[in-house]
Amino acid sequence: MKKIIWGIDLLFSTSLVAGAHTCCHNSAQKCGCKRGYYTQYYGDKPELIKEAIAWAESGVWRNGFDKAKPHSSVNLADFYLQYQKNPQQWQALFDYLAKTDLLSIPKGKHKIPGSDLVVSVEDSKNEPLEKRRSESHNKHIDFQYVVKGTERFGVIDHYSSTPNCKYRPDVIHYDYDRRKARFYDSNPGEFFIFFPRDWHIAKVATDSEDQTIRVIVIKVDYKD
């Protein structure tokens, strides 16, 4: 069942994007299109999607890390392509996660041995959606693994979102339509990866009383 979910979610996401591209190229408001654009489009590359799903299911990327799998929202085609282009950083990342006690390590920033990656261990609290900012990055990929508590992540629609500030390395923020945003709650058995086309919101309050979280954040270089 886990394997099926991975594949269906990616294909569903890309089919929505395909509909949005067909309906309108510039703005959903111009044609009344209800579909959105949430992640990099690979719907015209079915073989790549199949290859990426098979690769993700095989676990060859794990490098000893078996505590979690990609959340169903993760764009597996992006994950697959970026891993092939930058294996050293990804291998170091998963090796670190496999060998580190993520619950007891002190909060703060730590260098990942054998790489130029830095892990940020954050003990934090979720906040109401209106207090959280959306963002995306051009040069880095956000790897986020919530090891304690539950964090709600949002992904916003490109067509109904507009930048509300100047780009400054390496982040830009957006005004967006909350009704078109998608939200996902974390669990310790899954991690999230936000690629440049995944405009996202982090640390959104959930429906539970306890909003305390520990999240592992690693910024991986994005390779064109």
Residue ranges and their predicted role:
Residues 185-204:
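Conserved metal-binding segment of the jelly-roll/cupin
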Residues 119-136, 151-161:
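Conserved short histidine dyad/triad with adjacent acidic residue
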Residues 112-116, 136-140, 146-148, 213:
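Short connector loops at helix/strand junctions that flank enzyme active sites
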Residues 139-151, 157, 167-172, 219:
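Short, conserved beta-strand element in jelly-roll/cupin
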Residues 35, 41, 49-120, 131:
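A short, N-terminal "cap"/entry segment at the start of jelly-roll beta-barrel domains
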